[in-house]
Amino acid sequence: MATKLARLATWLVLVGCLLWRAGAVQLSPPNSRTNDLASGTPHVARGDTEAQSGTGDDSDFPQAVVEEVADMSGGRVPRVPASSTTTSASEGIFRRLVRRLRRGRGTADGAGVADETHQGPRPPLRKRLAQHFRRLRGFFGRLTPRWLSGLGRRAQRWWRGRQRPLLDPSFHGLEAGDSFMRDLLKREEELIGYCREEALKEPAAMVEAVTATVWPQNAETTVDSLLSQGERKLKLVEPLRVGDRSVVFLVRDVERLEDFALKVFTMGAENSRSELERLHEATFAAARLLGESPEEARDRRRLLLPSDAVAVQSQPPFAQLSPGQDDYAVANYLLLMPAASVDLELLFSTLDFVYVFRGDEGILALHILTAQLIRLAANLQSKGLVHGHFTPDNLFIMPDGRLMLGDVSALWKVGTRGPASSVPVTYAPREFLNASTATFTHALNAWQLGLSIYRVWCLFLPFGLVTPGIKGSWKRPSLRVPGTDSLAFGSCTPLPDFVKTLIGRFLNFDRRRRLLPLEAMETPEFLQLQNEISSSLSTGQPTAAPSVA
């Protein structure tokens, strides 16, 4: 504690000395005897002094009268008047030291006295303070902690944010781009269904075990709401996809005649009862963080919040369902949410199988996906939230064409520290690979946004990172492993320059210089992207693909 107080006192003394030095001025009135002595001509008025010195300016530095003595060669050599000695003697030691320091800053090789006679008007106090502050910052720059060195930049960014009008990245109902995506994907519904079936072949044993546990003899299952919404009778329609710890099914509420996606969790070391209870709290805490209902969050923020959490009737919630199988134990905790048509990961796998986004319509679809991804991330930033899984397998295109972000349990309040392992390793920037914990900032979502947009145009990840499910992807497991850091677009669908610029700024390895989603919406590149989409949709003529040089 004493050390900290001593450091604080030292800083205060240094700053006080600099401020006193910068503000040191003559306190006597202009026509006083003190000024007469300073000019070297006692009892002479200011005007007479100017006449003798040959100057007529109103400088705050009175010009000294210089005597001349004969040189051996016949010339004249200027000499400082004798009265200056008297003046120096009459001043205090510290005052003379300050004056000499002030004179010596702009001189070199002993030219201080000669240069002072030619000084112009004294700079204003504000400029002198700024100059001294720059000197102080340069002197103590290496001793300043990193968090303090960036304080000015953060304050400047905060002030700019207060000065400019706040952007509203929220969505307003169904937009023209959504209808275009709906019609485009509807034409490829059969192909997407085929690719979904292929993706479910490998985990078929897990899907069958979970299905038999939740729907014995393929009968309807009665579930009770954990949110006081009553009971439901759910009938299985088909499996949709498999995650690391869950299986998602398409089900029908036989009484309300509504279709939902039902997320069923498997139990294990990572899905213990306490972990599922924490997951339940985190999932429905997202609505409280947003201050919006699940319906409003889906409509305005495009966040896919669950409609309900349910448990199989007559069995304890969060416990293991019985009868079940030891290899694939199922938790009695199920999430109901609106069903999506396709997630971006499955869409990329489909495009890798048969690239259907060809021609002008395909290019327009890529433009729309790019703009919607940026707005999705900007919505999170506007609410002060960070999503740890802003990844293609967690981004869904709904039946009406809207792009939504799922798994709201991965939402963090900005500035919160959490486990770095909660971020998928191939989508983690370097600041999340150097320690066991990391601070969740908007820079994380900016990085993941850049990777997702890159995959929209290129299907695979950049920097040689491995991309499961994509033919010909690279093998680098993460940025922790040495490899290329250059951003290449040679194997991608031809990109417009403004999209390349946005991707490059999102994928800046320096997180302090990384372009954030809200800032991206103010860039000329994003405005050009929006204009391309609007003009193509309004005229009915899709935007042309960029030419390849």
From Swiss-Prot:
Similarity-based family: Belongs to the protein kinase superfamily. Ser/Thr protein kinase family.
Protein name in UniProt: Polymorphic pseudokinase ROP5
Keywords associated with the record: ATP-binding, Cytoplasmic vesicle, Disulfide bond, Glycoprotein, Metal-binding, Nucleotide-binding, Secreted, Signal, Virulence
Binding site for ATP: R241, D244, R245, S246, K263, M337, P338, A340, D343, D393
Chain sites annotated for binding ADP: D244, S246, K263, M337, P338, A340, D393
Subunit structure: Component of a complex at least composed of ROP18 and ROP5. Interacts with GRA7. Interacts with ROP17. Interacts with mouse IRGA6/IIGP1; the interaction results in inhibition of IRGA6/IIGP1 GTPase activity and/or oligomerization.
Protein kinase domain segment(s): 234-527
Coiled-coil regions, chain positions: none
Function: Pseudokinase. Essential for virulence in the type I lineage. Mediates parasite survival in mouse monocytes. Required for the parasite ability to resist mouse innate immune effectors triggered by the IFN-gamma (IFNG). Reduces the accumulation of mouse IRGA6 (IIGP1) and IRGB6 (TGTP1/TGTP2), immunity-related GTPases (IRGs) that protect mice from infection by certain intracellular pathogens, on the parasitophorous vacuole and IRG-mediated killing of parasites by mouse cells.
Positions contributing to Mg(2+) 1 binding: D393
First and last residue of the signal peptide: 1-24
Keyword RNA-binding: no
Changes seen on gene knockout: Gene knockout results in reduced virulence in mice. Recruitment of host monocytes to the site of infection in mice. Faster clearance of parasites from mouse monocytes. Reduced levels of mouse IRGA6/IIGP1 phosphorylation following Toxoplasma gondii infection. Increased recruitment of immunity-related GTPases (IRGs) to parasitophorous vacuole membrane. No significant effects on host gene expression. No significant effects on parasite growth in vitro.
Record's subcellular location: Secreted; Parasitophorous vacuole; Cytoplasmic vesicle, Secretory vesicle, Rhoptry
Phenotype for H389D: Does not affect ATP-binding activity. Does not restore kinase activity
Residue pairs linked by disulfide bridges in the UniProt entry: C458-C492
Species the sequence originates in: Toxoplasma gondii
Glycosylation sites: N434
Comment on protein domains: The protein kinase domain is predicted to be catalytically inactive. However, ATP-binding properties are preserved.
GO terms, molecular function: ATP binding; metal ion binding; protein kinase activity
Binding site for Mg(2+) 2: D407
